[in-house]
Design a protein with these regions (language model features):
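Glycine- and Gly-Pro-enriched alpha-helical subdomains that act as flexible
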Residues: 96-99, 106-150, 154-155
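Ordered, amphipathic secondary-structure segments that act as subunit-interaction surfaces
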Residues: 67, 74-108
Length: 195
């Protein structure tokens, strides 16, 4: 069971590539939602309003199933796809790479564009800090007050993060634990009910 994934830190990775007087500025961001992607891309379009193209690609989610590549007026699959290819090759997720192109007056051709966008993305990724994050699952358990010591012994033993707890005649605890250990935690807590 996969219970971790690779992403980048919150520090923006910046890259640069130049080819036949065209300049490619690349920026890699840690993102978690499509709304965040839209906001960042809109910000770059506004900041670099005089640039010819603002191409990007992103991948979201621990399963890496939500992704998109945008060519922003470049010939089909010459900008967004090479950027996405670098994200895929690096096995990263929760990432957005934006590449701004300033046209230098000389056409690069499709292969030249593919190389330029790919190299700009590679440079941005080279200036990022890669981090591994755990996939966690929430476990909620309701119990009676006399069971408190047994529940807390399991919590101490398995070391989940305590998100919320209520202690009264009827108690409740909400825990966050690594996905691969969640079933074991549920099973151990459930066994307390039968003792």
């Amino acid at each position: 069971m996969i219970d971790e994934f690779k992403t980048i830190s919150d520090t923006i990775g910046e890259g640069y590539y130049t080819e036949k007087r065209s300049k490619f500025l690349a920026f890699a961001h840690h993102v978690t939602t499509v709304d965040e992607v839209k906001e960042i891309v809109a910000g770059y379009r506004k900041k670099y309003y005089d640039a010819r193209h603002c191409c990007y690609a992103y991948m979201l989610g621990s399963e890496r199933t939500e992704f998109r590549a945008n060519d922003d007026g470049e010939p089909s699959s010459t900008a967004g796809k090479p950027i996405l290819g670098q994200i895929t090759k690096s096995e990263l997720t929760d990432i957005l790479i934006v590449v701004i192109r300033y046209f230098g007056g000389v056409k690069l051709g499709t292969s030249g564009l593919i190389v330029a966008y790919r190299e700009a993305a590679i440079d941005a990724l080279a200036h990022c800090e890669e981090v591994t994050q755990q996939i966690e699952e929430i476990v909620t358990y309701d119990f009676t007050y006399p069971m408190m010591n047994d529940v807390m012994r399991i919590v101490k033993d398995m070391n989940p993060r305590i998100l919320d707890q209520t202690f009264d005649n009827t108690c409740s605890i909400k825990l966050s634990i690594r996905k691969s250990e969640a079933e074991q935690l549920r099973s151990r807590l459930k066994m307390l009910s039968f003792e």
